[in-house]
Structures are given as C-alpha cells and as structure tokens.
C-alpha cells in the first residue's frame, strides 16, 4: 500500500472507529457513513478524499479494516470501535483455541485483570498464532496468549467474528488463557 493510501486508511480508521465528530460526521447505529457525507465533512477539515481513493483503500487494505455497503454508497469499519456501534454480529462457535498477541510489558496487568477491550467494544482474538505474533510486535517485544475458547463458550461467553475474520468477545478472564511465547 503506498503512503497516500496508508495515510487515508489511518484517517478512516480514526474517524470511523473512534472520532466521527472530529469532522462533524454522523454514523448510523450500525457504524455506517455515507461516502458523500464523509468526503464533504473531511474536506471542511482539510482532508481531501475522493470516492475512488476511499474505495481503493477498502479494496487494497490487507487487514480488510473497512466494508462498503452493497450499493457502494456507505462505508464502515469492520471492528475496533471505541464508540458504540451495532455491527449486527451473531454469536458463533469459535475454534477450540484462539490467540491474542500483545507486548510483554502488558503481561502482568493482563494476568491480573484478564484481557479487557481497552477502550474498544471487544477483545480482538486471532485463529492463527502467526497473526497474534505480528499483532504483538506492533506494541513491542511480543508475547502470545493461547485462549481456551471452547471452555469459555461452554461457560457462557459469546464469540463473534468480524467481516475480516477477527474473533471478538467482551472479556477473557485469566483462567482461560496461558502464555505460549
């Protein structure tokens, strides 16, 4: 992804996941924004977007952070919101084991409190160890936690999967995970 697309992706993440009000944009209950309104609101705050650039970011983003509506007129972030949105996610049966990547400096707090959403709506989990390591590296020296998702679900915890394959849950108490690296 070139630098311009990366910058637009970061801007869209910030606006659609955390601060739509920063550009006077209103999202609907499902987190959707009209692309035309997004372009107009962004331009009033010196961020110049086009429908073509927005759609290119959606298509080229390797993490599939965004989704377009079927008619191509609306956009939303797939997950990671710190604002309340209803993503219409249905509970699903997760794989027996899921992973969470983090930095080792956060481990003591995580072991004491469990995995918390940390300002987001959900805790983000991965079906792959490799993805969890990559996520952990973004925050420093990585460590990976292996979550017993089968046991959690059996104990009544709900799991969801976002459009881009990230597994989500509200909280992971410490008794359901072990450090594997």
Curated annotation (Swiss-Prot):
One Gene Ontology term of the biological-process aspect is: tRNA splicing, via endonucleolytic cleavage and ligation
Q: Looking at its record, which EC class is this enzyme?
A: transferase
UniProt-listed Gene3D superfamilies: 3.20.170.30, RNA 2'-phosphotransferase, Tpt1/KptA family, N-terminal domain
Say which domain of life the source belongs to. Bacteria
What would you give as a GO molecular function for this chain, any one?
tRNA 2'-phosphotransferase activity
Entry keywords, A to Z = NAD, Transferase
Assigned EC number:
2.7.1.-
* Keyword NAD part of the UniProt annotation: yes
Q: Which family does it belong to?
A: Belongs to the KptA/TPT1 family.
PANTHER family xrefs: PUTATIVE PHOSPHOTRANSFERASE (PTHR12684), TRNA 2'-PHOSPHOTRANSFERASE 1 (PTHR12684:SF2)
Stated role: Removes the 2'-phosphate from RNA via an intermediate in which the phosphate is ADP-ribosylated by NAD followed by a presumed transesterification to release the RNA and generate ADP-ribose 1''-2''-cyclic phosphate (APPR>P). May function as an ADP-ribosylase.
Q: What is this protein called?
A: Probable RNA 2'-phosphotransferase
């Amino acid at each position: 992804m070139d630098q311009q697309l990366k910058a637009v992706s970061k801007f869209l993440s910030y606006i659609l996941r955390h601060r739509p009000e920063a550009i006077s944009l209103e999202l609907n209950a499902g987190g959707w924004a009209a692309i035309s309104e997004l372009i107009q609101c962004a331009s009033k705050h010196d961020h110049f977007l086009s429908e073509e650039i927005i759609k290119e970011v959606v298509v080229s983003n390797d993490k599939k952070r965004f989704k377009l509506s079927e008619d191509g007129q609306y956009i939303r972030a797939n997950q990671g919101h710190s604002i309340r949105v209803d993503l219409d996610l249905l509970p699903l049966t997760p794989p027996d084991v899921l992973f969470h990547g983090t930095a080792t400096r956060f481990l003591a707090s995580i072991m004491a409190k469990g995995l918390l959403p940390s300002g987001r709506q959900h805790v983000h989990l991965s079906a792959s160890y490799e993805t969890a390591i990559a996520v952990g590296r973004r925050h420093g020296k990585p460590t990976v936690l292996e979550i017993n998702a089968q046991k959690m679900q059996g104990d009544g915890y709900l799991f969801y999967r976002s459009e881009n394959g990230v597994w989500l849950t509200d909280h992971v108490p410490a008794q359901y995970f072990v450090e594997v690296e």
